[in-house]
Amino acid sequence: MAVGKNKRLTKGGKKGAKKKIVDPFSKKDWYDVKAPAMFNIRNLGKTLVTRTQGTRIASDGLKGRVFEVSLADLQNDEVAFRKFKLVTEDVQGKNCLTNFHGMDLTRDKMCSMVKKWQTMIEAHVDVKTTDGYLLRLFCVGFTKKRTNQIRKTSYAQHQQVRQIRKKMMEIMTREVQTNDLKEVVNKLIPDSVGKDIEKACQSIYPLHDVYVRKVKMLKKPKFELGKLMELHGEGGSTSAAAKPAEGDTGAKVERADGYEPPIQESV
């Protein structure tokens, strides 16, 4: 056996020695997620992000994050089958300011509506709002039995389906084209568009369960902080607070260089 030093022992301990465990949450911060002013519940929850280190800025990691929230949580409501997507567009202090990014129906709601002995009619259309957002809206509706109908099935003819689909596209285009994004979202919350379609198609074939089932955001205009602040109900107040009222400007006081106020004996 050769006599010599054991190299492994001189290198300082075992090869598989335990490393110091660092808690990953110690390098992260919590930020509040704020919904736009269209919704009743503004505080959605909190999100986690790694603190600013060198060139990696925390706010850059938050911008573009998409949160999917049930409408019941946003409106403090019982009806919970609509989900809204909100995207973080700016970070102010510890608050993530979000904007509308899309809408969807839950899978269980969609499955519960699809049944036998009826016709399902779907339509989709790409529309641009007045403030430059390009949206793709998907609509769904189902035929129902006429009053005093004895027959089990309620199938619509192909020509009637085409007429209903055309009417769906017309109403969706009209409702979005003439409004900005804020007004469109205000119409999506109670789904007034679906009710309008149901009423308009009554003369062609009676419908039920008519919903705008999905809204996709295809294109957005260039980001403007002022417009986002308006959506959050802070645009007008900040600019008004910054400007002093007329007559409140005050008079300039002339003081010598190195002036210090006298020390008061009592406060």
Swiss-Prot record:
GO cellular component: cytosol; cytosolic small ribosomal subunit; nucleolus; small-subunit processome
Coiled coil: none
Basic and acidic residues compositional bias, start-end: 245-258
Family, as annotated: Belongs to the eukaryotic ribosomal protein eS1 family.
UniProt-listed HAMAP family: Ribosomal_eS1_euk (MF_03122)
Subunit: Component of the small ribosomal subunit. Mature ribosomes consist of a small (40S) and a large (60S) subunit. The 40S subunit contains about 33 different proteins and 1 molecule of RNA (18S). The 60S subunit contains about 49 different proteins and 3 molecules of RNA (28S, 5.8S and 5S). Part of the small subunit (SSU) processome, composed of more than 70 proteins and the RNA chaperone small nucleolar RNA (snoRNA) U3.
Protein name per the record: Small ribosomal subunit protein eS1
Organism: Danio rerio
Gene name in the database record: rps3a
